[in-house]
Amino acid sequence: MIKPALSALAAAATLSACAQNASPETSPAQAATVSPRIHTVASKYPFAETVTRLQNAIQAKGMTVFAVIDHHAAARQNGLEMQPATVIVFGTPKAGTPLMVKDPAFALQLPLRVLVTQTPEGVQAVFTDTRALIDGSRIEYSEVENTLANAEKLIRAVVTQ
Protein backbone atom coordinates (compact mmCIF):
# COMPACT_ATOMS: atom_id res chain seq x y z
CA MET A 1 0.00 0.00 0.00
CA ILE A 2 2.87 2.38 0.72
CA LYS A 3 4.63 1.47 -2.53
CA PRO A 4 1.68 2.49 -4.79
CA ALA A 5 1.28 5.71 -2.81
CA LEU A 6 4.98 6.53 -3.22
CA SER A 7 4.77 5.80 -6.96
CA ALA A 8 1.78 8.11 -7.31
CA LEU A 9 3.56 10.82 -5.31
CA ALA A 10 6.70 10.50 -7.46
CA ALA A 11 4.64 10.72 -10.64
CA ALA A 12 2.82 13.80 -9.38
CA ALA A 13 6.10 15.46 -8.41
CA THR A 14 7.59 14.72 -11.82
CA LEU A 15 4.56 16.11 -13.65
CA SER A 16 4.57 19.18 -11.45
CA ALA A 17 8.25 19.81 -12.13
CA CYS A 18 7.71 19.41 -15.87
CA ALA A 19 4.79 21.82 -15.82
CA GLN A 20 6.83 24.44 -13.97
CA ASN A 21 9.75 24.15 -16.42
CA ALA A 22 7.58 24.21 -19.51
CA SER A 23 8.04 27.29 -21.62
CA PRO A 24 5.08 29.01 -23.21
CA GLU A 25 4.07 27.43 -26.48
CA THR A 26 5.73 29.12 -29.45
CA SER A 27 4.08 29.02 -32.83
CA PRO A 28 6.21 28.10 -35.86
CA ALA A 29 5.87 31.68 -37.11
CA GLN A 30 7.23 33.04 -33.83
CA ALA A 31 10.05 30.53 -33.81
CA ALA A 32 11.11 31.52 -37.32
CA THR A 33 11.28 35.20 -36.49
CA VAL A 34 13.58 34.68 -33.51
CA SER A 35 15.82 32.05 -35.08
CA PRO A 36 19.42 33.13 -35.72
CA ARG A 37 19.13 31.13 -38.94
CA ILE A 38 16.43 33.44 -40.28
CA HIS A 39 16.73 37.21 -40.68
CA THR A 40 13.68 39.45 -40.57
CA VAL A 41 14.21 43.01 -41.75
CA ALA A 42 11.52 45.69 -41.59
CA SER A 43 10.91 47.36 -44.93
CA LYS A 44 10.33 51.07 -45.08
CA TYR A 45 8.24 50.59 -48.22
CA PRO A 46 4.71 49.30 -48.80
CA PHE A 47 4.31 45.61 -49.61
CA ALA A 48 4.03 45.80 -53.43
CA GLU A 49 6.84 48.33 -53.69
CA THR A 50 9.10 46.15 -51.55
CA VAL A 51 8.50 43.18 -53.87
CA THR A 52 9.17 45.30 -56.97
CA ARG A 53 12.27 46.95 -55.50
CA LEU A 54 13.76 43.58 -54.57
CA GLN A 55 13.07 42.09 -58.01
CA ASN A 56 14.61 45.11 -59.75
CA ALA A 57 17.68 45.16 -57.49
CA ILE A 58 18.26 41.42 -57.94
CA GLN A 59 18.12 41.77 -61.72
CA ALA A 60 20.29 44.91 -61.68
CA LYS A 61 23.01 42.85 -59.95
CA GLY A 62 22.97 40.35 -62.83
CA MET A 63 20.99 37.69 -61.02
CA THR A 64 17.95 35.91 -62.38
CA VAL A 65 14.52 35.97 -60.77
CA PHE A 66 13.51 32.35 -61.37
CA ALA A 67 10.06 32.58 -59.79
CA VAL A 68 7.77 34.85 -57.83
CA ILE A 69 5.35 32.90 -55.67
CA ASP A 70 2.32 34.85 -54.46
CA HIS A 71 1.03 32.81 -51.53
CA HIS A 72 -1.73 35.35 -50.84
CA ALA A 73 -3.15 34.97 -54.37
CA ALA A 74 -2.91 31.17 -54.21
CA ALA A 75 -4.78 31.17 -50.91
CA ARG A 76 -7.53 33.41 -52.33
CA GLN A 77 -7.90 31.12 -55.38
CA ASN A 78 -8.66 28.33 -52.95
CA GLY A 79 -11.13 30.28 -50.85
CA LEU A 80 -8.64 30.96 -48.06
CA GLU A 81 -7.37 34.16 -46.51
CA MET A 82 -3.90 35.05 -45.38
CA GLN A 83 -1.66 38.07 -45.11
CA PRO A 84 0.17 39.26 -48.24
CA ALA A 85 3.16 36.95 -48.68
CA THR A 86 5.36 36.68 -51.76
CA VAL A 87 8.52 34.61 -52.16
CA ILE A 88 11.10 35.70 -54.72
CA VAL A 89 13.33 32.83 -55.90
CA PHE A 90 16.59 34.13 -57.36
CA GLY A 91 20.24 33.49 -58.06
CA THR A 92 22.91 33.13 -60.68
CA PRO A 93 24.41 29.94 -62.09
CA LYS A 94 27.85 31.61 -62.00
CA ALA A 95 27.73 31.59 -58.20
CA GLY A 96 25.64 28.49 -57.55
CA THR A 97 27.02 25.98 -60.03
CA PRO A 98 30.53 25.65 -58.52
CA LEU A 99 28.97 25.16 -55.08
CA MET A 100 26.66 22.41 -56.35
CA VAL A 101 29.58 20.74 -58.15
CA LYS A 102 31.52 20.66 -54.87
CA ASP A 103 28.49 19.49 -52.86
CA PRO A 104 25.59 18.19 -54.99
CA ALA A 105 23.23 18.17 -51.99
CA PHE A 106 23.73 21.94 -51.72
CA ALA A 107 21.32 22.19 -54.65
CA LEU A 108 18.57 21.84 -52.03
CA GLN A 109 19.57 25.29 -50.70
CA LEU A 110 19.57 27.00 -54.09
CA PRO A 111 18.27 29.15 -55.64
CA LEU A 112 18.11 31.70 -52.87
CA ARG A 113 14.74 32.93 -51.59
CA VAL A 114 13.40 36.01 -49.89
CA LEU A 115 9.91 36.27 -48.42
CA VAL A 116 8.13 39.61 -48.39
CA THR A 117 5.19 39.59 -46.01
CA GLN A 118 2.80 42.03 -44.40
CA THR A 119 2.44 41.63 -40.64
CA PRO A 120 0.68 43.75 -38.02
CA GLU A 121 4.14 45.26 -37.37
CA GLY A 122 4.58 46.23 -41.04
CA VAL A 123 6.18 44.89 -44.20
CA GLN A 124 9.07 42.50 -43.64
CA ALA A 125 11.72 40.84 -45.77
CA VAL A 126 12.61 37.40 -44.40
CA PHE A 127 15.55 35.28 -45.58
CA THR A 128 17.88 32.51 -44.45
CA ASP A 129 21.26 33.42 -43.00
CA THR A 130 24.17 32.55 -45.32
CA ARG A 131 25.98 30.61 -42.61
CA ALA A 132 22.80 28.61 -41.99
CA LEU A 133 22.57 27.81 -45.71
CA ILE A 134 26.03 26.26 -45.74
CA ASP A 135 25.74 24.60 -42.34
CA GLY A 136 26.15 20.86 -42.76
CA SER A 137 27.47 21.18 -46.31
CA ARG A 138 30.96 20.90 -47.75
CA ILE A 139 30.88 24.62 -48.53
CA GLU A 140 33.11 26.99 -46.53
CA TYR A 141 32.02 30.53 -45.73
CA SER A 142 35.04 31.90 -47.62
CA GLU A 143 33.54 30.36 -50.77
CA VAL A 144 30.29 32.33 -50.43
CA GLU A 145 31.27 35.54 -48.66
CA ASN A 146 31.54 37.44 -51.96
CA THR A 147 28.51 35.81 -53.60
CA LEU A 148 25.68 34.38 -51.50
CA ALA A 149 26.48 36.58 -48.50
CA ASN A 150 26.17 39.64 -50.74
CA ALA A 151 22.53 38.73 -51.34
CA GLU A 152 21.87 39.35 -47.62
CA LYS A 153 23.48 42.78 -47.89
CA LEU A 154 21.47 43.57 -51.02
CA ILE A 155 18.15 42.62 -49.40
CA ARG A 156 18.90 44.71 -46.31
CA ALA A 157 19.92 47.73 -48.38
CA VAL A 158 16.94 47.56 -50.73
CA VAL A 159 14.31 47.47 -47.98
CA THR A 160 15.90 49.94 -45.57
CA GLN A 161 17.36 52.70 -47.78
Question: What would you call each of these model-derived segments?
Answer:
Residues 1-7:
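Bacterial N-terminal signal peptides that target proteins for export
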